[in-house]
Amino acid sequence: MGHVEKEREKSRVSIVKVAGRDRALVAAGVRQAIELAGGMADLIRPGMKVMIKPNMVAPPPSADSGACTSPLVCQSVADVVKELGARPIIAESSARGADTEAAYRIMGYDDLRCLGYEVVDLKRDTTVQVKLAGGHVLTEITTFELVTQMDAIISVPILKTHDQGQVTLALKNLKGLVVDGDKRRIHQLGMFEGAVDLVGHFKPVFAVVDAILGQEGMGPLLGIPVEMGLVLAGRDLVAVDAIGGRIMGFAPDEVPITRVAAERGLGSLDESRIEVVGERVEAVRRRFVRCEEDDRIDSEGIKVIHSEGTCTGCRNGLLSSLFDMQAAGTLERARGTTVIAGPTPFPEGIPQEMLVSVGSCSLPEAKRLLRYVRGCPPNNVDIIRALLADDGEAT
């Protein structure tokens, strides 16, 4: 192929409608999406070990919350991989402090194990340190031995919003391939640059997005489920994320990780350079409620403040504590409180008695507050005690 012709080649992203959530319909939709996106026959060869990487951020409130990738989607991708003569392994490590096995159990991945599919909790695997050539903020990471043995990685996220980067899709999904300590370190060094460093290192070959049931609002765990009935697929993860974000109502350059990955040359952000096949974006898009627009907690008179350095474990623990209090009818007692999560600067003009600080990585002045909750991640019971002003510092 000539240089000019190669430059004109577009990234292809498929969008396929799925008529329901039963096994046969999901399998047909996933297969069609993969085929429309160019298939994987030239990427996956007989004898290869192929990691299928779902998004299992943490144990979700339910299997229908839109927080975690459906096992039916992963099963369908695994079947395609097996047909190509390769060995598919579904593997994940959930957010810092989160129980991957509990997430698998709630979502129904144990059923796949019963059927003979390999489903691995990476947190139980041996860890290894590897160097990152060309990393912008990461020069070394600790990953898992199984990951280093893979011949190819397929990112299989779910379509959802995120409280730090607008959305979390195929690119950010790779953060689950490092140990909990590095997940936290990435947030502290710069989440978007760090996540793109991981993409550049692991080089996923394909993405299949579970957009059958997504999540809007306070993602990545405690948002509101959204029925979309779609599957997206493509080889260019930047293009896949750009189109996935567009379907949710986000311009591609609004999403920091997509923008950074494109700037590094990892894929196409320019929609004029992306060929969408199957359904048209205009026909399926739906503006998702953004995290800052989800006022379920703000309406209760509680203000939550976090920064890019606040990791998923802290944010999820805090929000789940607030929703637990809301369900128990005790959130009213914390009205007027401002909660600072992780290494986040103090807001001005708020009396210290109305502040709660959460997380062992809090700034020194935050740790001196009467209501400071240590822990990485902090325990929900301790967070609730602090919010209710029970016994001062929680440990």
Task: Give a label for each model feature.
Residues 1-395:
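N-terminal and secondary-structure boundary signal
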